[in-house]
A protein has these predicted regions:
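Short, Lys/Arg-enriched N-terminal segments with co-localized hydrophobic residues
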Residues: 26-39
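Substrate-recognition/specificity elements adjacent to catalytic centers across diverse enzyme folds
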Residues: 60-351, 356, 362, 382, ...
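Second-shell loop/turn segments in exported
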Residues: 101-105, 142, 151-164, 495, ...
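Glycine- and hydrophobic-rich flexible loops that cap the catalytic core of alpha/beta enzyme folds
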Residues: 373-383, 390, 394-399, 403-574
């Protein structure tokens, strides 16, 4: 490499190190290669997978009712210990020390989830091809470029000594299990016989990957979309149409966590935990502070940059790990949580509820575990992230907690001007000065599958180096183009808060032993990236809500202006849009940049209204007026201290709105209990239908009156329309399956009951409405956009936009008449035509080709059962028999010829089970994301008295054929729970197996 380019040895230069063969003990001083991974469907590799099912619960694995009295002698243990499995598969680890408890947590993780965690570390590290073959080399290149493993190395170095010791113990436990047991069946299918030893860095990578999935975002799509609007409409009209009509920041429902809980607005710099602010928040005076409309005219992106953005976006579209991250709002990757104070409950104790939403993979993302070391004050039970130690969601003897994702904006994407010199060195340009790009060489290997040779890795030819921009928090160049004649060019770089030495996992180490609000808040100071909303309850009767994360202060926003474009567009990398570097860092700082102080992040303790709700909605209400940049931070003396910017688009708000509505309904009727909380978690009422369906009744009522246009009258008289209108008029907006083979919350413990007539009627209405929703978006929004060559918004934005347009009779703030194509003498009549034509189109579609596999061309609306459309699948890494439906008994498809299990739910419901808002074919309503865990906790009055219940979409084990592979799934599907048994006596009364351990002599 030529002078001028900084060349450093890279963690991406993986040299294949020592491995642990099945049954081989690890040796000290092994050179360990650590990898990452990524979930892929590899059913084509598994023609004989069905033969693996019977023997998959291999020797050395637990089995229900199996007792093991002989203690296993393990090097590394400090004292005697035991693992008790209860009848639900939960491992309860009782150990001499916290270190031993974490060692055995590693042991049970390997026992239950070895292949899963191997895939996870390989995903994030960009070495998945070494496991699953050359088909994912492109994904490895992209993940290696983003540098999660490099970032994890920084975090590992910054962790405290107790944290690193815990990671080491956990890794030793994983490797100890591998040394004594055969590898799971997936490895045989991939011709792998050796496992690369787990390291503390691997757990740090898993933690970094989770933070990435919950916080990373590229600004490419919104930039490309707005550029098109500008080109077609011109700057002023584009701004009005884009921000005001189509891609709105304001939510569908205005539920906002802290203002709703406290009855007062959140004022950054004035409000404090548990103390409502004194008045309405100050809105930013744009004229007085130089933030005028010209600043919002869109990014200044040249043709080369436009091409780079499209090229990179196309590259990552097939990378499910990245695509899931970028589309997490569309895919309902979020969570629900709320807490109710004892003043509103039956027993006078607080209630805490939480259900995090992620992809519904098999095995589940979370691993149930109970960790006990009385000597070291550890007694925590709940869910761990497979691949990392400690409990991340759950309870200890004093406090209980849950989490949801905030949606804070902690990523900026930049257009860089670059210069390549004749000697081959490469530079970016900042304020007219050249700054060197760091080049990291990278080599990629892949598993050669099908050649009959085990553990055969080959080197991929022609692999590109990685280009790093130090100014961007060591973020990468995603793509670039250089003119060979001049050496001048353009690049796209990205800056993410998580690239720094952040310490999220440290938070969970501290939460596992927190005793009160003070301990809890102290632990949250380490949650630097992957910003979360934390819900809290304790045995002292407190409830609380806190947001976390280091939201960077941008230099222009801090100066009360916007330089060029807002942070959610591609910004100039040549100066004026930088994150402000910290001169001095505090012990808990992670990113190295100035950030919104913790005290200015939305939070409340024991709020005035006695409850608090978050479901990824706007926590502070800063976007309710559709402008995320018109509130200021209040500094010393009440003076403005920069723009208060958290993010530009939170969840569209239907879940938070419905939870708030349901709580209000129940509290209005009296006091509530844990059963009420579980019922709200199971709620499948469509809040958007409650708002939008009345337009159908109104339109039909108008259409049958005298004097309307012939076209509108004809629609009202078309076959089946009046029947459909009647069904929707009597509907309660719930979404049961309407099928005896479907799973509904009204069923019990996985046992499916015959639906009532009321459930059948609601099921039919849900089908008709859900297809109408797609058609009214198509007719009322997409027709106009498509006709002008303008990009469509995504599902959540589309539902927000169609509500906005229906409320305005189709006339946008841009003055565009979105319903102008429809016949009618007035805007209101054209609105009615769009609404009824969409219902006519929905009925025609249901009786046509698009839904024939479900409804066989039937025009009988009684046949339109929702369960035939709304189906869930649980996908395993290798697909085929490992998935559900698959080889697991008891979970066959609900209907012949239709994949998946019929379940209640739908778009934007509390019991997250969303599909695309434009779903227009029988298979479009199938989904694979939702609650990865449900939890309700009721803190008592003394230590150890928290009653917790949970649900898991599968089981503790990831080993196909194991009795705990899917034992909890039936209860999950019918919204039933299993108890978290924290007291030893309760565990012993519900014991399935036990294993003792002792230190090696």
């Amino acid at each position: 490499v030529a002078p001028g380019v900084i060349l450093r040895s890279s963690p991406d230069e993986h040299a294949r190190g020592a491995v642990l063969s099945s049954g081989q003990a690890p040796e000290q001083g092994l050179s360990v290669m650590s990898n990452g991974g990524y979930t892929m469907k590899l059913a084509a590799l598994l023609p004989a997978c069905a033969l693996l099912v019977a023997g998959a619960a291999h020797a050395g694995h637990h089995a229900s009712g199996k007792w093991k009295h002989d203690a296993i002698s393990l090097p590394g243990l400090e004292g005697p210990a035991r693992i008790l499995r209860d009848v639900d598969g939960m491992p309860h680890i009782y150990a001499h020390s916290e270190r031993d408890a974490l060692f055995l947590q590693g042991w049970v993780t390997a026992q239950d989830r070895l292949f899963q965690i191997d895939v996870l570390r390989r995903t994030a590290s960009g070495t998945l091809a070494e496991l699953v073959g050359p088909g994912v080399i492109g994904n490895d290149v992209q993940l290696r470029m983003l540098g999660l493993r490099r970032a994890a190395e920084r975090s590992l170095a910054a962790y405290s000594k107790p944290m690193r010791e815990g990671l080491e113990a956990y890794a030793e436990g994983i490797n100890a299990w591998v040394a004594r047991n055969p590898l799971p069946a997936e490895y045989a299918a991939l011709e792998i016989t050796k496992f690369e030893p787990w390291t503390p860095l691997d757990s740090a990578v898993v933690g970094k990957a989770l933070a990435f999935q919950l916080s990373f975002g590229l600004d490419i799509d919104v930039t490309l979309n707005f550029l098109t609007y500008q080109a077609v409409l011109g700057p002023a009209a584009a701004q009005a149409a884009f921000f005001g009509d189509v891609f709105r920041s304001a939510p569908f429902d205005p539920a906002s966590s802290v203002p709703d809980a406290t009855g007062a607005p959140w004022i950054p710099g004035v409000s404090s935990p548990g103390i409502p602010g004194p008045g309405r928040g100050r809105k930013h005076d744009r004229g007085g502070h130089r933030h005028d409309e010209s600043a919002m005219r869109g990014p200044r992106v040249d043709g080369v940059t436009h091409g780079l953005l499209k090229r990179y976006r196309d590259k990552v579209r097939d990378n499910a790990f990245i695509e899931r991250t970028l589309s997490r709002t569309e895919r309902q990757i979020g969570s629900n949580q709320w807490a109710v104070s004892g003043s509103h409950t039956v027993n006078g104790r607080p209630l805490v509820a939480n259900d995090p939403h992620l992809s519904l993979d098999l095995p589940p993302n979370f691993h149930p575990v109970h960790l006990v070391s009385r000597r070291d004050g550890l007694d925590a039970i709940g869910s761990a992230v497979a691949g990392a130690p400690w409990v991340v969601l759950g309870q200890n003897r004093h406090v209980t907690w849950g989490e949801t994702t905030t949606g804070f904006d902690v990523t900026d994407t930049y257009q860089e001007r670059i210069q390549a010199l004749p000697d081959g060195s490469l530079f970016t340009t900042y304020q007219g000065q050249l700054e060197p790009v760091v080049v990291l060489p990278a080599q990629y290997r892949f598993n050669v599958i099908g050649d009959g040779q085990a553990d055969n890795l080959a080197v991929a030819p022609g692999t590109p180096p990685l280009l790093i921009v130090p100014r961007r928090n060591h973020g990468p160049i995603l793509d670039l183009e250089v003119d060979p004649a001049t050496g001048q060019g353009t690049a796209i770089s990205v800056q993410w808060a998580g690239n720094g030495p952040t310490r999220e996992l440290e938070t969970f180490r501290l939460l596992n032993r927190a005793r009160n609000v003070r301990d809890f808040v102290a632990a949250l100071q380490y949650f630097d990236v992957g910003s979360q909303n934390f819900i809290y309850g304790d045995i002292e009767g407190n409830i609380g809500y806190f947001t976390t994360g280091e939201v960077p202060l941008r230099e222009d926003l801090q100066a009360l202006t916007v330089n060029g474009v807002p942070p959610w567009f591609i910004r100039s990398g040549e100066g004026g849009n930088e994150w402000i570097r910290k001169d001095r860092t505090r012990r808990t700082d992670g990113t190295g940049y100035e950030y919104v102080p913790f005290g200015e992040l939305p939070q409340t303790v024991n709020p005035a209204n006695g409850w608090v709700v978050n479901a990824n909605n706007d926590p502070a209400g800063v976007t309710l007026d559709n402008d995320p940049l018109n509130q200021v931070r209040v500094g010393p003396g009440g003076l403005p201290n920069g723009l208060y910017y958290l993010g530009y688009a939170f969840d569209y708000g239907t879940r938070a709105g419905r939870i708030t509505q349901a709580l209000d309904e129940r509290l209005g009727a009296g006091r509530v209990d844990a059963e009420d909380m579980k019922a709200i978690q199971a709620d499948v009422k469509l809040l958007d239908a409650e708002v939008l369906a009345p337009y159908i009744q109104q339109a039909f009522g108008n259409a049958v009156t005298a004097g309307v246009s012939a076209a509108l009258a004809a629609l009202a008289g078309s076959p089946g329309l009046a029947e459909a209108v009647g069904r929707l008029a009597s509907w309660d907006f719930t979404t049961p399956t309407g099928a005896v083979t479907g799973y509904d919350a009204s069923d019990v413990d996985g046992e499916r009951l015959v639906p009532t007539q009321a459930e059948i009627d609601s099921s039919i209405a849900a089908t008709i409405y859900s297809v109408w929703r797609a058609k009214v978006i198509g007719n009322g929004l997409d027709t106009t956009l498509d006709g002008s060559g303008l990009p469509r918004p995504g599902s959540g934005e589309a539902v927000k936009a169609i509500r906005h347009l229906l409320e305005r009779d189709g006339i946008g703030v841009s003055t565009i008449d979105f319903f102008g194509w429809a016949p009618g003498s007035s805007a209101a009549e054209r609105r009615d035509f769009v609404v009824l034509k969409s219902l006519r189109d929905a009925l025609d579609a249901l009786a046509g080709d698009a839904f024939a596999p479900a409804f066989a061309y039937s025009t009988d609306q009684d046949d339109y059962r929702w369960g035939k459309l709304h189906r869930i699948t649980f996908d395993a890494v290798l697909g085929g028999p490992f998935s559900i439906p698959g080889a697991t008994p008891g979970f066959d498809p609900s209907f012949p010829g239709l994949s998946g299990l019929a379940v209640d739910g739908g778009f934007g419901v509390v019991d997250a089970s969303s599909h695309g808002a434009r779903a227009s074919r029988y298979d479009d309503f199938r989904f694979g994301s939702g609650p990865n865990r449900r939890y309700v906790g009721v803190p008592g009055t003394v230590p150890g008295s928290i009653d917790g219940e949970s649900a898991l979409p599968g089981g503790a084990s990831g080993v196909l054929g194991d009795p705990f592979y899917a034992n909890l799934l039936g209860r999950y599907l019918t919204n039933d729970t299993y108890p978290l048994r924290q007291n030893l006596g309760e565990v012993m009364r519900n014991l399935a197996s036990q294993q003792a351990f002792r230190p090696a002599r």
